[in-house]
Amino acid sequence: MPQSLPFSPAWLAFEEAVRGASHRGDHLRIIEGGGLSVDLTAQAYSPQLEAAGLALCEQQGFALARRQLFEGGEANWTEHRPAWHTALRAALPPPSVAKDILNERERLRRFVDEADARGAYKYVLHLGIGGSDWGPRLVARALRHQGLKREVRFASNVDSHAVADAMHQLDPHETLVIVASKSFTTTEPLANAEVAIHWLQNAGVADPIKQVVAITANVDAALDFGISPQHVFRFWDWVGGRYSLWSAIGLPIALAMGNNTFDELLAGAAAMDEHFLRAPLAANAPVQMALAGLANRSVMGFNSLAIAPYDSRLAHLVPWAQQLEMESLGKVATRDGSPAGVPTGPVVWGMTGTDCQHTFFQWLHQDTTGAPVDFIVCEHADHTYDHHHRLLIANCLAQRAALLRGKSFEDALAETCARVDDPSEARILAEHLVHPGRRPSTLIVLPRMTAHNLGALLALYEHKVFTQGVLWGINPFDQWGVEFGKALARGIIGELDKPSGMASADPSTRYWVDLLSRRS
């Protein structure tokens, strides 16, 4: 049974080891897993810290929790169900769910093959939100250099400007609309589906609903919506929204790039699953990333994690990771209801390189706190501008080295004295050139941007987050804060439609509901 962290023996030893560890990056630590290289050299390290991290995993019951994750145990204990997304990408799914998974995979494959054979649909309009949007959106952007069979557009926000932009210049007669919602009650995809169906109707499409596909765990609701059974693809309650890319939610990927590309994505994630399951914990990339994250957040007090993919194709990785990490770890209650007792999930933010260098890296280098950074880069590019790719890699490595190395006052003073005659002015200027250094970072290297490597990268982050949830003692598979906000929104929309005073609301909410209901 996991222990409350703050005063547990393994946590106290881990905390002491972090404070006593080297932060100079003088011990080369590179882990190979799932086809990726994960370089943790610039994270805190000592043999004592490595041992303390393994002891913490043992104390918190990590081995049992990992086994339950892969065997369909109650990993999501507050909702009393598994979190079995790993089964979706296994070549041979667990026997109890294999028939359902393989049948749905085959239905998906057949739908895509038949559409290809008929030359059906030039465009796909994917309507989801959160996990049903960010995963396929990320993959579609990251792999489009491989060529597209169909153009895919995404709309998620309930702001109808977004869906109007997505539909702009599409041919309604050649567009397949995908409505992706686990519950098939979520406001955003259903509201956008109504807009899309009206768009099809207004264009003279004879039977608009025939061009609509549903992906959901609530098949009955999709059928009630009017979608034909042949166009309803299923996933299950034990698949969390932010882990649903590996299910039928991946349909737009298969339609855009082919079934084989989606298969390779699953295979890459499965390869990282195997690494996570089999590799010793000291050489286990997700586990060691998780322990580094605990050291940074819960001991050294870093409030955030920056993600800097030095590849423009990974532009959507940051919001995908924001949802994965912050929706999974943005909580404090442990299994018995007591608080974790230490800082938990960090704020996740970032941008692709080299744009990020001209946006927020100044803060990373010289702010009083800074933040750990995950650098991500591909060894090989998929263009012919070799010099440009070398520039990209050089910038990535240089920024990481600068964050680690820093610049002392003495070095800065030697630099300023060489170009400023006045010693007093040289000393003042030198203060501005000091970089604290010893800022932690991780470097993740993909050999090339392929579906396999991308699948492995996403699974790496999934398993890191799972491990941190186990070590902090929190459930990474629920999202009660999201549900609370949704419930309040339902009450407010009722008031905007038919005001009654909202006596229980705060004064500001009452003011704006009253004002906007009268003006609308």
Swiss-Prot record:
Belongs to the GPI family. Pathway: Carbohydrate biosynthesis; gluconeogenesis; Carbohydrate degradation; glycolysis; D-glyceraldehyde 3-phosphate and glycerone phosphate from D-glucose: step 2/4. It catalyses: alpha-D-glucose 6-phosphate = beta-D-fructose 6-phosphate. NCBIfam families: PRK00179.1 (NF001211). Its EC number is 5.3.1.9. This is Glucose-6-phosphate isomerase. It is found in: Cytoplasm. InterPro entries: G6P_Isomerase, G6P_Isomerase_C, Phosphoglucose_isomerase_CS, SIS_dom_sf, SIS_PGI_1, SIS_PGI_2. The keyword 4Fe-4S does not apply. Its main location: cytoplasm. Disulfide bonds: none annotated. GO terms for molecular function: carbohydrate derivative binding; glucose-6-phosphate isomerase activity; monosaccharide binding. Gene3D superfamilies: 1.10.1390.10, Glucose-6-phosphate isomerase like protein, domain 1 (3.40.50.10490). The keyword Magnesium does not apply. The lineage of its organism: Bacteria, Pseudomonadati, Pseudomonadota, Betaproteobacteria, Burkholderiales. One of its GO terms (biological process) is glycolytic process. Catalyzes the reversible isomerization of glucose-6-phosphate to fructose-6-phosphate. The active site is at E327 (proton donor), H358, K486. It comes from Bordetella avium (strain 197N). GO terms for cellular component: cytosol. Keywords: Cytoplasm, Gluconeogenesis, Glycolysis, Isomerase.
